[in-house]
């Protein structure tokens, strides 16, 4: 048996009780799990401070001396505060505990010399260390101690007496037990070319570094390895899919595309749109299945690019579908496509949950006999009973509302899978896109169509409602429409937020002359659709809503987005909401309304929003503030985000390096049959077996 797979219970210092806590709280079940539970920071322990040198704001420090005496203070409810008065000959401080008196009196003795490690604070004009680490000075070689590792722990662990220091000791016990070098998981040609230290050295140095250089070299090696295998898994999956499924070959740019380009194109394409259309055309003409992600802010012209891609499919004798996340967005796409294709002899139909009876049969029959060229719908399109004559291209709008499983269902509609174009207005940072949508090629539309004015974003405090309401009234009197967004539907007992229902009533009193709609997440879909339709058709001037309006709808006449309690929203969410306006030729505004109690992080979010409209710049900032697991879409991606040491937000260069190296391997050994790569394929198999998320896309 591999010693690294040994049950953690059998490690000296663990036992059955600690085993259960480590497993439940940290997911540590084996020696390997403990080795791969990495420190989150280090403190230099080569320096010993004098008590006279201590300061109130110092980080963790160590002092050396002896205990003068013990003292106990009754805190009531059978609790005691135990204080040891400690001196190093240059001053006196206190060591403080709030429990564990038996252990303290049994293990620590007056006049014996100890090394104390902890964070100093001041109490009653004297420095104290609360629950410090204490070591016998005679057993420590202070000059050789190096860096002290710190490990994250939970409250339950602390109550059970398992601290960062405990994990440090357990890890030390394990490393001393592992006499033989730990097995290598990267081939020599990679470690030598990239100047990486061995896995054996990295795992030992990450837990017991002597210097900062040790920690950095260990981290680079372990981060690279982790990211490399994530990328190898994704790229192998994509390679397997390409070899397994032969894509349709669209060789023709025919009359439908040319007619549209010559007669119906509403405005000159931006350079970004032209570039993306070329990328899509190259994919669909390669004979391999296209899997492409198209990113672009709201209003950047993604739908037009998708339509021109659909016309290439139609010119080659194939059907196409466009899937949207909601019925109202599907209806809007249908209307947009019909306007674009006016006068062209193409049959376009809608297929959503509301299409029933005779009409539904007409549509399903038209898909089977091939008389329908383009179908627009919701997830109803991927139902098993919906069949196509020859589906050649599937366009999916707002990918994160669907997910990998739904995308895979489309592949089963034909003998060969259709080309796939995924569109999203949620900006995805480059490093994250490589990981979430690693099996997709990425295109970006980073220009707005001509004539669009950048949205002006303004920050107002909630005490400035008079000027806010005056601005709203002025815009509506100019013929525009306004969104007003609330963060919650029901009041929280702990957080005082505006309630949409009471807010709606208050706004009706402020604007009695205007008609208003409201939508929120607890309404039935039909109610939401009806209210939204009133606003889309211009029958209401103000739409009061929660964040359910993030996705989709296109109301060019809406020129103002007011976001109340904007401090409660993440950056990407604020940007998505802002993208609902700015779709017409008129100047649009986004008003971020907050209270005066703003944290430093909230101020940064507001400042970023007010200073840039660049979705990718915002997404990068959001990734650094929140981490990848919190970003919309990552949970449905099928990619693991429980990275143990790498950080996608901060390790962008390593992500790119790992992808480049993984791509070289796939290019050199697409069928995973070359013996020189056996180490990699065997390790990847181990990781897939151990990680449910990886297996889900494999």
Language-model features: locations:
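N-terminal cationic and glycine-rich segments that engage phosphates or anionic surfaces
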Residues: 128-131, 137, 393, 409-410, ...
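Accessory helical-bundle/CTD segments and flexible terminal tails appended to RecA-like ATPase motors
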Residues: 513, 532-542, 549-556, 561-564, ...
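OB-fold nucleic-acid-binding modules
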Residues: 37-68
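N-terminal pre-Walker A segment at the start of P-loop NTPase domains
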Residues: 263, 267-277
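Inter-lobe coupling/hinge segments of SF2-like helicase ATPases
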Residues: 275-278, 286-607, 671
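Upstream accessory/linker segments immediately N-terminal to the RecA-like ATPase cores of bacterial MutS
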Residues: 73-264, 668
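Long, highly charged, low-complexity intrinsically disordered interaction regions
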Residues: 1-12, 20, 24, 230, ...
């Amino acid at each position: 048996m591999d010693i690294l797979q040994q049950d953690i219970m059998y490690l000296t210092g663990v036992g059955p009780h600690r085993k259960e806590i480590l497993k439940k709280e940290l997911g540590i079940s084996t020696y390997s799990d403990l080795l791969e539970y990495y420190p989150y920071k280090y403190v230099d322990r080569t320096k010993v401070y004098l008590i006279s040198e201590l300061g109130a704001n110092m980080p963790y420090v160590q002092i050396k001396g002896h205990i003068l005496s013990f003292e106990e203070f009754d805190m009531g409810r059978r609790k005691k505060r135990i204080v040891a008065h400690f001196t190093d000959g240059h001053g006196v401080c206190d060591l403080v505990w709030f429990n564990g008196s038996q252990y303290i009196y049994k293990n620590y003795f007056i006049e014996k010399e100890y090394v104390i490690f902890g964070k100093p604070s001041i109490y009653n004009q004297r420095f104290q260390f609360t629950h410090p680490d204490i070591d016998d000075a005679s057993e420590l070689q202070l000059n050789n101690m190096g860096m002290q590792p710190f490990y994250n722990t939970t409250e339950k662990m602390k109550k059970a007496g398992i601290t960062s220091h405990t994990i440090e000791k357990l890890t030390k016990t394990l490393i001393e037990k592992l006499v033989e070098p730990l097995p290598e998981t990267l081939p020599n040609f990679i470690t030598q070319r990239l100047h990486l230290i061995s896995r054996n050295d990295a795992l030992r140095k990450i837990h017991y570094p002597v210097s900062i250089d040790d920690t950095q070299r260990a981290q680079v090696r372990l981060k690279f390895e982790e990211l490399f295998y994530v990328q190898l898994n994704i790229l192998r999956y994509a390679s397997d899919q390409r070899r397994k499924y032969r894509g349709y070959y669209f060789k023709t740019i025919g009359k439908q595309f040319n007619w549209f380009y010559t007669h119906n194109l509403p405005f000159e394409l931006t350079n970004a749109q032209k570039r993306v259309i070329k990328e899509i055309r190259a994919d669909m003409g390669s004979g391999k299945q296209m899997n492409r992600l198209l990113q672009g802010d709201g209003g950047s012209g993604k739908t037009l690019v998708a339509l021109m891609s659909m016309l290439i499919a139609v010119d080659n004798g194939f059907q196409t579908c466009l899937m949207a996340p909601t019925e109202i967005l599907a209806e809007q796409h249908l209307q947009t496509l019909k306007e674009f294709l006016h006068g062209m002899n193409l049959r376009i139909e809608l297929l959503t949950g509301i299409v029933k009876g005779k009409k539904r049969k007409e549509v399903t029959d038209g898909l089977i006999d091939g008389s329908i060229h383009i179908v627009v719908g919701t997830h109803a399109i991927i139902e098993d009973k919906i069949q196509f004559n020859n589906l050649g291209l599937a366009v999916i709008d707002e990918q994160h509302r669907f997910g990998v499983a739904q995308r895979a269902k489309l592949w089963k509609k034909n003998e060969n899978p259709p080309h796939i174009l995924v569109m999203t207005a949620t900006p995805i940072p480059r490093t994250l896109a490589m990981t979430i949508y690693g099996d997709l090629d990425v295109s970006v539309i980073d220009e707005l169509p001509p004539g669009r004015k950048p949205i002006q974003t303004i920050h107002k405090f909630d005490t400035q409602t008079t000027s806010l309401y005056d601005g709203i009234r002025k815009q509506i009197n100019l013929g525009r429409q306004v969104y007003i967004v609330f963060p919650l539907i029901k009041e929280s007992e702990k957080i005082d937020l505006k309630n949409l229902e009471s807010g709606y009533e208050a706004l009706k009193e402020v604007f009695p002359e205007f008609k208003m709609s409201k939508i929120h997440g607890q309404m039935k879909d039909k109610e939401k659709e009806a209210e939204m339709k009133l606003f889309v058709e211009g029958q209401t001037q103000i739409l009061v809503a929660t964040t359910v309006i993030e996705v989709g709808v296109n109301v060019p006449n809406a020129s103002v987005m007011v976001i109340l309690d904007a401090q409660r929203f993440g950056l990407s969410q604020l940007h998505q909401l802002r993208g609902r306006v700015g779709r017409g030729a008129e100047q649009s505004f986004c008003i971020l309304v907050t209270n005066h109690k703003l944290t430093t992080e909230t101020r940064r979010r507001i400042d970023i929003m007010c200073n840039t409209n660049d979705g990718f710049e915002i997404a990068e900032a959001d990734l650094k503030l929140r981490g990848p697991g919190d970003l919309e879409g990552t949970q449905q991606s099928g990619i693991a985000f429980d990275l143990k040491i790498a950080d996608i937000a901060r390790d962008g260069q390593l992500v790119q390096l790992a992808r480049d190296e993984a791509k070289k391997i796939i290019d050199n050994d697409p069928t995973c049959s070359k013996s020189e790569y056996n180490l990699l394929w065997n390790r990847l198999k181990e990781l897939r077996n151990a990680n449910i998320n990886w297996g889900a896309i494999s």
